[in-house]
């Protein structure tokens, strides 16, 4: 049986998620897989690539043919270099750990408590202050016209 290592598309419209799978070469793109050996999330920043290196080496050794897209992923993880014996480094950056949401929330609360608060005026006081400033401005313009 001719096997291929290729991507199986999952996810909604415009939010693709892929699984790296080993399939019969004649099967549908999203059909039944022999084995799932990884996943790829291109929309995450940085993109998430998780591949079981041991299983990839096994399937490549048995003769499974990777597609061009999978070869590109394998080069980024360094698995293709292991298989071919190439010594060039892989281009994967480790994904930074996400901060805990509770810690972020508590930090924002602490920052809000430390910030100086401005005086809050009621609507009626604000309207009275506006009227007083308008009448004062009107009185000054009348004096200039007389002079």
From Swiss-Prot:
Disordered: region residues: 81-147
GO CC annotation: cytoplasm; small ribosomal subunit
Keyword set, alphabetical order: Ribonucleoprotein, Ribosomal protein
Record flagged with keyword Cytoplasm: no
PROSITE patterns assigned to the protein according to its UniProt record, in alphabetical order: RIBOSOMAL_S16
UniProt feature, compositional bias: Low complexity: 126-140
MF term (GO), any: structural constituent of ribosome
The keyword rRNA-binding belongs to this UniProt entry's keyword annotation: no
Family: Belongs to the bacterial ribosomal protein bS16 family.
UniProt xrefs under NCBIfam families: PRK14520.1, S16
Full protein name: Small ribosomal subunit protein bS16
Organism lineage: Bacteria, Bacillati, Actinomycetota, Actinomycetes, Propionibacteriales
Gene designation per UniProt: rpsP
